[in-house]
């Protein structure tokens, strides 16, 4: 059971570091998202998107 948990955690870490359609899949924090988008002179917003059976909390700049 512990091995399965470790594999799951490693998978999540690697998956969260991967690029998804040009956006980084992370657990989005609104304040951090707004700050990173402010550098691009855009408004930032956390959105939830699904890809297959996986759900991503993404920061999108508009």
Swiss-Prot record:
This entry's Gene Ontology molecular function terms read: potassium channel regulator activity; toxin activity
Q: Provide the protein's localization.
A: Secreted
Keyword Secreted (UniProt): yes
Output the Gene Ontology cellular-component terms.
extracellular region
Signal peptide (UniProt feature, chain positions): 1-18
Site location (Aromatic residue of the functional dyad):
62
Primary location recorded for the protein, binned into one broad class: secreted
Q: Where is this site: Basic residue of the functional dyad?
A: 45
Tissue-wise expression: Expressed by the venom gland.
Q: Which UniProt keywords apply?
A: Disulfide bond, Ion channel impairing toxin, Neurotoxin, Potassium channel impairing toxin, Secreted, Signal, Toxin
The disulfide bridges present are 28-46, 33-59, 37-61
Does the keyword Metal-binding belong to this entry? no
The family note in this entry says:
Belongs to the short scorpion toxin superfamily. Potassium channel inhibitor family. Alpha-KTx 22 subfamily.
Q: What does this protein do?
A: May block potassium channels.
Its domain comment says: Has the structural arrangement of an alpha-helix connected to antiparallel beta-sheets by disulfide bonds (CS-alpha/beta).
Name of this chain's protein: Potassium channel toxin alpha-KTx 22.1
Q: What is the protein's species of origin?
A: Olivierus martensii
